[in-house]
Design a protein with these regions (language model features):
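C-terminal transmembrane module of polytopic alpha-helical membrane proteins
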Residues: 1-21, 28-30, 189-262
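Cytoplasmic-side transmembrane-helix entry/capping segments in multi-pass membrane proteins
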Residues: 106-113, 148, 172-180
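N-terminal TM1-TM2 helical hairpin plus the immediately adjacent luminal interfacial "cap"
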Residues: 17-145, 191-218
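Small-residue faces within membrane-embedded alpha-helices
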Residues: 115-119, 153, 157, 183
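Alpha-helical transmembrane bundle and helix-membrane interface signal
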Residues: 100-101, 161-173, 221-227
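Membrane-embedded catalytic cores of phosphoryl/pyrophosphoryl-handling enzymes
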Residues: 169, 175-186, 195
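Membrane-interface micro-motifs in multi-pass membrane enzymes
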Residues: 140-163, 205
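Short, motif-level signal for alpha-helix interfacial/capping segments enriched in acidic residues
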Residues: 57-63, 154-155, 183-187
Length: 262
């Protein structure tokens, strides 16, 4: 990380420093991944499928398995090692700086809030047809796994806290601001959410994590603006009432007080 002409740039630091919360999450995720691999190897695909149905996020069953919006964050796809590697690398690269700014407890609260929130957004959207009497869609029985919802929430936090930070994005030869990177990712995720990306990636969870993180971090500004709007409305309302009162009593002679009250 360095400063040049007043612009902060961000380069991957290979000091391999791992903050406490990041260390906990890395160990937990890799431990669960190893357990998944061993279960698949020694018990076969049916047992692994049961694991995903129980602890992955299955929208049609989450009402009975209330732990799923939490546990799905620790499961990753065995079909590609890059799923967990990219998630954990991004967590380490960006999450440790957030933890240094926020502290361990606040960082963990934010991580799980965005991860669980992303899962709930996924559940609500996929179960929406059932609420309108159209039945439960087939996609509501497919388990969603991975920490990507929380990871995207972390990226949003970095874009809000460090908007001008310069990051290199492969394969682009020039660095982009953190805000620009997240905006581009939001556009891609939005298009993928509405079926414009033919893959098995849960773009909906990614978008949900970004949305929850943005709303949470911007809630102070929103509440401040809302409070000011209410105060302005009350002020103008009282001003109108005062003008009406003056209009009614303008011709009344002033009364002499018999005594003063302090």
């Amino acid at each position: 990380m360095y400063s040049r002409s007043g612009i902060k740039s961000y380069r991957v630091s290979f000091d391999f420093y791992v903050s406490p919360a990041i260390k906990f999450l890395l160990i937990a995720n890799f431990a669960v991944f190893i357990f998944e691999a061993l279960l698949y190897r020694f018990s076969g695909p049916p047992a692994y499928g049961e694991l995903l149905q129980w602890f992955g996020l299955v929208p049609a069953r989450v009402i009975l398995y209330l732990w799923q919006p939490f546990t799905y964050l620790f499961l990753h796809d065995l079909g590609s090692i890059w799923h967990i590697l990219m998630n954990m690398f991004t967590l380490w690269m960006f999450g440790r700086e957030l933890e240094l700014v926020w502290g361990r407890n606040r960082f963990l609260r934010y991580y799980f809030m965005t991860g669980v929130g992303a899962g709930l957004v996924n559940v609500i959207v996929k179960m929406a047809p059932a609420l309108f009497g159209q039945g439960i869609p087939r996609t509501a029985y497919i388990p969603t796994i991975g920490a990507s919802g929380a990871i995207f929430g972390i990226l949003v936090a970095c874009a809000i806290l460090f908007p001008g930070r310069r990051v290199y994005v492969f394969p682009l030869p020039v660095p982009l601001s953190m805000r620009t990177v997240v905006i581009l990712m939001t556009v891609v995720t939005f298009l993928g959410t509405f079926g414009l990306g033919a893959d098995n990636i849960s773009h909906l969870c990614h978008l949900g994590g970004m949305l929850v993180g943005f709303v949470y971090l911007r809630r102070g500004s929103f509440l401040y603006s809302l409070r000011n709007s209410v105060s302005d409305w009350q002020y103008h309302r009282n001003q109108r009432r005062f003008k009406i009162y003056l209009g009614k009593h303008r011709k009344d002679p002033p009364s002499r007080p018999d005594n003063w009250v302090n």
